[in-house]
């Protein structure tokens, strides 16, 4: 949708379904805006994902278009902005408190599809929905990741995150006790 066609901030807004016609049972997991060349990580909670541009998300079809293929029972996640594909990192968290960090450039650039494995989740645990990818964050070396668990938060800089760095599609390592139930992850930009 062109942003200038949306209701102004003075109004009550309006439902997205008034402007698009999603298939039966479909729902929105996120909204993105930006330049057509802006890149995003698109992923599912099954632990798969890829990099795509806003240009590949745009369609003239009111019913939309298929962008990400999700495993049965899986859920597409909110797309995450990439500012520098060659120098940023991807942090993948599971609901079991595992964290894996690797360069975001390790993901393929695709127009649509399932993508490749970001973090390894045992198939039996994934099928039963016991374990899944819960958060994806893209960050740079100067940024800090703030991990919130309940009322507590933990801020980690790049040198503290080195412990969780590994190859894409690995299992990831457990976060410290007390922070394994991750409610929210925030990128605190270091260049501001």
What is the role of each PLM region?
Residues 1-192:
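Short, structured "edge-of-domain" segments at secondary-structure transitions
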């Amino acid at each position: 949708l062109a942003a200038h066609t949306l209701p102004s901030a003075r109004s009550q807004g309006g439902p997205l379904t008034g402007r698009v016609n999603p298939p039966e049972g479909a729902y929105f997991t996120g909204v993105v805006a930006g330049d057509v060349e802006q890149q995003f990580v698109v992923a599912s909670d099954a632990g798969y994902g890829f990099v795509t541009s806003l240009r590949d998300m745009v369609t003239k079809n009111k019913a939309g278009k298929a962008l990400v293929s999700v495993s049965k029972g899986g859920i597409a996640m909110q797309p995450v902005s990439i500012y520098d594909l060659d120098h940023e990192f991807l942090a993948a968290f599971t609901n079991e408190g595992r964290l894996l960090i690797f360069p975001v450039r390790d993901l393929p650039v695709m127009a649509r599809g399932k993508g490749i494995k970001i973090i390894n989740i045992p198939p039996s645990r994934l099928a039963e929905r016991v374990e899944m990818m819960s958060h994806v964050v893209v960050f740079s070396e100067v940024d800090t990741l703030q991990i919130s668990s309940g009322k507590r938060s933990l801020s980690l800089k790049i040198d503290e995150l080195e412990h969780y760095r590994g190859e894409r599609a690995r299992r990831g390592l457990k976060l410290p006790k007390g922070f394994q139930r991750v409610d929210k992850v925030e990128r605190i930009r270091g260049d501001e």
